[in-house]
């Protein structure tokens, strides 16, 4: 028996290994993915097979990123949050949560979106450090934190 190493596995296999979905659900979602050309995680979410937290866990296991909770998002420093415009944050489901002199910690729903990561680096001139969060947690935090800022 081989050891399971999530960093070498596809998202679907991680979700099966973690008991979040069954093989039949993965097969159904993969068939739909051929038609819709969407990310597997989004299809599984749309079908109600997984939760946002299941997807965040799978991303964190696969990519080695930490998960950040909705409560921790709401404790973000507003000066840091405001480094990214509200429109950009909403459009890309990303929120700045912490910074140092050289880095900016981001919470993202899709940590594989390199275009967003590159854009944040250009906007802030800081090296992004990625954390994963659920879509609803990010949307909620964006709404509350940018309301406080405005």
What kind of feature is each model-predicted range?
Residues 1-3, 27-32:
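Short, recurring structural edge motifs at helix starts
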Residues 2, 17, 42-123:
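Polyanionic, low-complexity intrinsically disordered segments
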Residues 5-14, 36-43:
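Short, solvent-exposed linear patches
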Residues 11, 25, 55, 116-119, ...:
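Hydrophobic side chains in well-ordered alpha-helices
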Residues 69-73, 80, 137-150:
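Charged, low-hydrophobicity low-complexity segments
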Residues 127-134:
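Short hydrophobic alpha-helical runs that function as membrane-insertion/retention elements
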């Amino acid at each position: 028996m081989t050891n399971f190493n999530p960093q070498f596995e596809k998202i679907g296999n991680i979700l099966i290994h973690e008991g979040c979905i069954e093989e039949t659900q993965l097969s159904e979602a993969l068939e739909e993915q051929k038609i819709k050309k969407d990310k597997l995680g989004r299809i599984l979410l749309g079908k109600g097979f997984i939760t946002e937290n299941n997807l965040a866990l799978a991303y964190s296991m696969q990519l080695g990123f930490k998960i950040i909770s909705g409560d921790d998002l709401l404790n973000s420093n507003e000066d840091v949050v405001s480094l990214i415009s509200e429109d950009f944050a909403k459009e890309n489901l990303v929120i700045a949560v912490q910074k140092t002199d050289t880095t900016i910690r981001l919470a993202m729903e899709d940590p594989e979106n390199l275009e967003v990561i590159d854009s944040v680096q250009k906007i802030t001139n800081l090296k992004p450090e990625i954390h994963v969060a659920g879509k609803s947690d990010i949307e909620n935090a964006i709404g509350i934190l940018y309301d406080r800022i405005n």
